[in-house]
Amino acid sequence: GGEDYLRTAEDSFFAVYEREGAGYFLKNFADFFAEDDLTVVNLEGVLTDNNALYPRDKGKGDDGYWFRGPTEYAKVLSAASVEVASLANNHAFDYGAQGFRDTIAAVEAEGLGWFGTYNKNRDPETEKFYFYTKDGVTICLMSLLWDDYNPQDPNGNGAYLRQQISEIKQSGQADAVI
């Protein structure tokens, strides 16, 4: 939980992190992840140390959920041999564009790759695909920001992502797109 009152609970993520360290949370998977070729996770939240950031309005009043943790929480992923994080989900911009940029910086500081598509404007700050090659086979990983997905919108992100999949396949940049 990213809300301040949840940080004080003895069994909160925050308290357990302080007590047990970054390696605790995925310790039962770390050996498995270390042996695989590529571990990919969905990072469902914002990593930022900027306490001046406020949750963005999701149009749900007080019924929405906003997730945030300090940037050091990226160590949870690197400690477990996670290599790549999808950042495109409905919580990516819970704390606005700055929160998103802070999340990217935190993930990159731990040596992790990331991917996600946020808009069709080809802004390198908000769009990235991840390419991985093993034994001569290249895959491209893509994900799409949930809030903006409307498959019926011919100018929306869904149409744009379908176009990108087609272009990557036709250009030979990847053998498979996931």
Report the location of each language-model feature.
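Acidic, metal/ion-coordinating pockets
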Residues: G1-V177
